[in-house]
Amino acid sequence: MSSAKEQSSVTAALQPEQWTTSSNEALKLFVTNPEAALNFQPTFTYPIFGDAETIYGYKDLDIFLCFDHYTFKPFLNIKYSAKLTDDPEIIDIKKTIDEFLPKSTIFKDEVKWVDSIKEEKDNGYKIPGKLIDSFSENDKEYDIYKIDLKSDNGYELHQRLQILVLLFIEAGSFIDAKDELWNLYVLYEKDNKSTSNNEPSIVGFTTAYNYWKYPGAKKFDSTEQESRIKISQFIILPIYQGQGLGQLFYSHLFDKWLAQDDIIEVVVEDPNESFDDLRDRADLKRLNTSEQFDFKAVTPKVDKEWVEKTRRALKLEKRQFARLLEIILLYKLKHGYPGITKRDVRLFIKKRLYDKNKEGLATLDDNTKKDKLQTAYQALEDDYYRILGDLKLNIKRENDEEETDTVSKKQKV
């Protein structure tokens, strides 16, 4: 930048730390709306700036990446007080980031960015997709849109959003949005203020892939096609986190897929711990109200046919349904439900752990094998109780039901 000092790298050779900046700290993200610019920091920057997540050769470096709350049009600005000039390790920051941003990104000229956003809106910008669901939470209203990736505006919106995948999902990568099997769902917060222009704000998004499932020879010639939905990327902007919106977003999407006959299963690609937590709690709450799920059937001797039939009806993948059954068993154990013993629950969970790790355990002697299984079980039990927290499941004891029946009979007399 012309306003910054340019210095020879020889002068900095003995003090490289003064010219080295954490890229996680230098990159400052903003979402701007008519009232404020909301700031948040990235979790990762290594996909852009390398594994060390550092930038060498600049002093007092700040990288500003801003997005409009509605169109998500990006603005990039880079500021520093001094820059080294003759070191091959020094990167061109703008050129480096440009590889991950759409061509519509405005650089440095903030007035031009504001004018370009206004121009888009004046030309009738609308959310490029179909409204598929709505919900309310904490006196606010939210809409879920399925974005039309075949349209120019839909594809462009994805191009604007996708850099967040690199910044907030470990090992995240871009998808081929031109592949027709990819779907993009975006969550918006509606603006119902009488003094505003009623523009919604992007809260988060998820990408999901449709996998066609071979139905077997009997159904192969059928006109009905079955598919699996695989959730690939799932992001709630940090400025909206901590409000339960991710869980609601996931649950409302799952309910939509549950109602579609052509979708037979919903799976998740390499979920991290935070998404596992969100998913476990959301799925448990769905089971709480599902007419297809019988909590009484969940015992350490649960019928395998019931498990498979119920899992298919609920469109849950095997690993996830097994986790839910184990969590429910521990819930029953914790609350003293009859017929549930700690030993039986422990053996039930250990069996799945053993089957999952059979090859690795096969080379160990019996004592080591038992120790490994016990350690794995204890860690899982602790994690399940953490996930349960203060969640209340809709499970009635048999004596509770008998008491209810007695009261009902007395009322009829």
Swiss-Prot record:
It catalyses: L-lysyl-[protein] + acetyl-CoA = N(6)-acetyl-L-lysyl-[protein] + CoA + H(+). It holds the Pfam family HAT1_C_fung. One of its GO terms (molecular function) is histone binding. Keywords: Acyltransferase, Chromatin regulator, Cytoplasm, DNA damage, DNA repair, Nucleus, Transferase. Catalytic component of the histone acetylase B (HAT-B) complex. Acetylates 'Lys-14' of histone H4 which is required for telomeric silencing. Has intrinsic substrate specificity that modifies lysine in recognition sequence GXGKXG. Involved in DNA double-strand break repair. Component of the HAT-B complex composed of at least HAT1 and HAT2. The HAT-B complex binds to histone H4 tail. This is Histone acetyltransferase type B catalytic subunit.
